[in-house]
Swiss-Prot record:
Active site: K130, D162
Name the record gives this protein: N-glycosylase/DNA lyase
Pfam family, one: AGOG
Domain comment quoted from the record: Contains two alpha-helical subdomains, with the 8-oxoguanine binding site located in a cleft at their interface. Contains a helix-hairpin-helix (HhH) structural motif and a Gly/Pro-rich sequence followed by a conserved Asp (HhH-GPD motif).
Known role: DNA repair enzyme that is part of the base excision repair (BER) pathway; protects from oxidative damage by removing the major product of DNA oxidation, 8-oxoguanine (GO), from single- and double-stranded DNA substrates.
Organism in which the protein naturally occurs: Nanoarchaeum equitans (strain Kin4-M)
Family the entry assigns: Belongs to the archaeal N-glycosylase/DNA lyase (AGOG) family.
Length: 216
C-alpha cells in the first residue's frame, strides 16, 4: 500500500514548491523586501533555533533591523535569547568565513552541496543537521532576493527535521525516500509542508495535503 503522504505529494512538482516559496513563504518575502548579504543570512540561520516567536516573525524582524554582523549580535540578544551563550559562540565560529562565502556566493549557488559540506565542516556538525540544511535554504532565498534566478535545491541536501516533520516521521531516511518517490528535493518538500496551515483559499491538492497533516 502506497504511503499516503507520498500519494498526495505526487500531485505536486518543484514548480508548486517554487510558487509557495516566492509567494507565500514570509521568510523569503522578508528578504525580498530587504535583501541582505548572503553571509549575514547564513549567520542568522545558524542560530535560528529555540526561538521565542514564530520563525516568520523572527525573519521579518531580522530583515528590518540587521544590516551588519555587529547588528546581528545586538539582535540575537534582544530577539533570540534562549541559549544565548551558545548562539554567540556559533556566530564567533562562523564569523571568519563570512567574507569567503560572500566572495564565492555564485559558486556556492551553483554548488549548494559544496556549501552544505563547507558549513558542516566549519561548524563541526553533520551535513544533515537541521540548522546546517536550513542555512542552505535561507542562503538560496538570499540569492533569489538579490536577483539571482531560481535554482532547484539538490536532492542530496536533507530536509530540516523540526518538530512538525518529526510528528510525521522522525527518520531522515524516510524523507529521502519520499523525495525519491515524488521527484521533489527534500528542501522543496519542506516548502510545501511548512506554510500549509497559513495558506487560505487552498487549491484542491493543497487542501488534501493540509487535511492529511491536520489528522496526524
Amino acid at each position: 500500500m502506497e504511503d499516503p503522504l507520498i500519494k498526495i505529494l505526487k500531485q505536486f512538482s518543484i514548480e508548486d514548491a517554487k510558487y509557495v516559496e516566492y509567494n507565500l513563504d514570509r521568510q523569503f518575502l522578508a528578504l525580498k523586501e530587504n535583501p541582505k548579504p548572503v553571509g549575514l543570512v547564513i549567520a542568522n540561520a545558524l542560530i535560528s533555533y529555540q526561538l521565542t516567536m514564530p520563525g516568520e516573525r523572527y525573519w521579518e524582524l531580522f530583515a528590518k533591523k540587521v544590516n551588519s554582523f555587529n547588528d546581528l549580535y545586538d539582535f540575537v540578544k534582544k530577539y533570540n535569547p534562549r541559549f544565548l551563550s551558545n548562539k554567540l559562540k556559533r556566530l564567533e565560529r562562523f564569523k571568519p568565513y563570512i567574507d569567503i562565502i560572500e566572495q564565492n556566493r555564485e559558486h556556492y549557488y551553483e554548488n549548494m552541496v559544496a556549501l552544505n559540506k563547507f558549513l558542516a565542516k566549519i561548524m563541526n556538525q553533520n551535513i544533515y543537521d537541521k540548522t546546517i540544511v536550513f542555512s542552505i535554504k535561507m542562503f538560496a532565498y538570499a540569492m533569489r532576493a538579490l536577483g539571482y534566478k531560481f535554482k532547484p535545491f539538490p536532492f542530496e541536501i536533507a530536509i530540516p527535521l523540526d518538530y512538525r516533520l518529526k510528528k510525521i516521521n522522525p527518520d531522515l531516511n524516510y524523507w529521502f525516500y519520499v523525495s525519491k518517490q515524488t521527484n521533489i528535493p527534500p528542501l522543496h518538500i519542506d516548502s510545501l509542508i511548512w506554510p500549509i496551515f497559513r495558506i487560505k483559499n487552498l487549491p484542491k491538492k493543497f487542501a488534501l495535503l493540509k487535511e492529511y497533516l491536520s489528522n496526524l
